Amino acid sequence: MPKVKALQCALALEISSVTCPGVVLKDKEDIYLSICVFGQYKKTQCVPATFPLVFNARMVFEKVFPDAVDPGDVVTQLEYDTAVFELIQLVPPVGETLSTYDENTRDFMFPGPNQMSGHHDSNRQVTMRRISGLRGNAPRLEFSTTSVITECLISSRKCHTQDKFIYHLAPVEKSHGRLQNRTSRSQKKKSKSPERSKYCINAKNYEQPTISSKSHSPSPYTKRRMCELSEDTRRRLAHLNLGPYEFKKETDKPPFVIRHVDPPSPRADTLLGSSGRDCERDGWSRVHNDHSHLGCCRPKDYKVIRTPHGRDFDDSLEKCEEYLSPRSCSKPRHSARTLLVHSAPSTMPKHSPSPVLNRASLRERFHSDWCSPSNCDEIHDRVKNVLKSHQAHQRHLYDERDLEKDDELELKRSLLCRDSAYDSDPEYSSCQQPRGTFHLDDGEYWSNRAASYKGKSHRPIFENSMDKMYRNLYKKACSSASHTQESF
């Protein structure tokens, strides 16, 4: 590879201290100074948080300009670069920047108007920005610079530059540190170690972790946020083992889905109500021939009607029979209820039918003839035995007592309604009379319940009442006629 000449600009920076009289920091964490020149970041060692901050650090920044022809071109390109100083305190979680100072790199390296190469300026002072939240003077930075522009070969630039980076990696803390650094530098130049190229490649200071990141363990939230930074920052923070985290945004979450169930149609509701009322009938339950089921009533029958939904049309009727717990057969009751079941849409997965629906009826399972004379006779005999039992007799007495009480209550209610109706309006009294109750005579009332209790029909009672009425009218007419004759 041919060697090409280029111009190299080097800056030797010596930082002595940072002073800020009359200012006391609230936090007591250590402080360090971060410097960025030529796009290269370097930092001093940490010092206690008490002014003045004495650093006594020395560092070198170098950059090669292969396209530059003379030093004037280098100075022109330096005008597009900025030198930045940051005073950082190690306050968790990521540190706090107390004060900053930035200046054009050309003016920072060559403060004079005609100074280009070989400039040395000692005991320089610049005023940094005021610390936010604190009263008092702004921090003042004391340092010295030496700027040099020289020719170099591009092929040997990396090793030459990185060797100087290794030499200036450890800042100077004591007054005799310069002699030690110079001695180590001369020894490194003389020694030709085979690992020299390795140090030159891995000694990039701006890719190393910062002191602030090494001083504390970041929280899980900070880790996720750090993973969202640039690739250069990820490489610089690789020692934290952040992992392949990605901060999830709100837009990445899947939408919350709510299933909507179609309400039953009003037609189905009316069909359900009417069929439920019309199909409910009272009757004696039929008992099976098997003696193991004696004393049990036949369970209610449920008819399942599937209405068409979409393209599914199922008009078949399936009969479901289920056993109920044994109960008294003194008042057996049989009711057939019709259940309306909407079939699921074709897109929805259909559930497997219940095994009860596919089960054969009692007649098919036991092959018995319900209409045979033997079954009918057996049923009548069993019903007679049940009615003659002590339990049925007690229940019959209770029913008679209940009928008497109901008749008395009904008579009292009719009398109360009649009195209240007569007090308000005579015409309104007819509307307030209980339905099916008629006034006969001498405070007697006749109703359907009284007819069933006495065993008489309405016709003879009506004729008797009319006979009494006409007889009374005739007696009154006769008595009135006799009174008039006596008066004359």
From Swiss-Prot:
Residues linked to a glycan: 181
Q: Which domain of life is it from?
A: Eukaryota
* Record location of the Glycyl lysine isopeptide (Lys-Gly) (interchain with G-Cter in SUMO2) cross-link: 248
Signal sequence segment: 1-20
List the GO terms this entry assigns under cellular component, sorted alphabetically.
extracellular region; motile cilium; sperm head-tail coupling apparatus
Stretches the record annotates as Disordered: 176-199, 256-275
UniProt keywords (A-Z) are: Cell projection, Cilium, Developmental protein, Differentiation, Flagellum, Glycoprotein, Isopeptide bond, Phosphoprotein, Secreted, Signal, Spermatogenesis, Ubl conjugation
GO terms, biological process: cell differentiation; motile cilium assembly; spermatogenesis
Where is this gene product found?
Answer: Secreted; Cell projection, Cilium, Flagellum
On assembly, the entry states: Interacts with MYL6.
Q: What is this protein called?
A: Spermatogenesis-associated protein 6
Q: Which organism is it from?
A: Homo sapiens
